[in-house]
Amino acid sequence: LTDSASTANPSDSPAAPGFERLMYASLCTVKTSVFDEMQRIRAHALKRNVADDVHVALLYQSGWFVEWMEGPSKGVHAVMARVARDTRHRQIRLLHSSHGRRRLSEPWSMAITQTQELPTDFARRVMEMREHHRLGQELDPAAVWRRLSTPLTHPGAREQALNDHFQRVIVVSAHGTDSFDLVRWLGQSQEAEVVHRRFAGSRDDMLDVATDYVDVDTGAVVRRVIAMARNGLQIGLTQAFLSDYSHAVLLLSGDAERDHQLMVRMVAACEQQPRRPVLLGVGSPACKHAELRRLAHKGGLVYLDCERGADDGVAAVWAATEPALDLSLATQSGWPGVGGSGWDRLSGT
């Protein structure tokens, strides 16, 4: 299965370790609500894909679908055979094929990205990634996903696979929408586009969640700052990218119980990650940093506290956060994340 709908199996490498990982893009033919249709796809996938032990993430953006799947070869091929017969899309393009660890931690995740791009803009990136695949220049599946979903107008859009050119930071607030307020403020102050997305996972008892991001060119690197809803930490697609983040910024509320619950969620989300972001706890002097640090260390995470003073405005929050992010650029050795970042030594863990 390469450039058109076909039931032929992708090439297999029995000697390669881990799960088979495939990614394709296709033109969406859905004429009604795409989100509603993706929910119907989800209901079907949770029955069929689970039986095949295949984990899947589905993206809709600019008139295109992108599907990332991981699992045993037999199961992946069974899913692709069903994909080839599905009339909700056409012009299937295989963009990635490899064997390796499974990044997607749950059977189903999906994302809808809102941008001003035309389908032809997205198509150019699809053709670029198709050519990389044809030439055997395989990137990690997460890097392919980022390359496809990053608008070409963003700084460094074509260099998403180069970690030394990028710093990726996730921001989650213990209460309210502070993380989204911060990203919106960064977009306004830096005159940079804020990209709005919705994520959903496998759980029936959890609604879809918002996640926004902004790409800011600092000169030294392009810094992507991602606002994530608290519930979003439980979604497989969110967890698939955690090992690529240098830091997770926790915007603390000063309410000990809320801050505790946020830390518990973050530790759980990072539990299976081979590399983990450094945690920055940003809050007032009243925050219980010692307890949060204890929880982080128990979960194998580095925790640094960043006090913002009495001012809780977004400018003050960023003023407390940015120096720690900048310092990591000077001390990095194999970041993102813990496992070579140098932060483990700086924090005494």
Feature locations, PLM:
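Conserved C-terminal guanine-recognition region of P-loop GTPase G domains, centered on the G4
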Residues: G254-G299
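Hydrophobic beta-strand residues in large extracellular and virion-surface proteins
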Residues: V169-V171, L250, L279-L280
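Inter-motif core of Ras-like GTPase G domains
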Residues: Q234-A256, M266-Q272
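Charge-rich, low-complexity N-terminal segments
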Residues: T2-V221, V225-D244, H260, H297-D305, ...
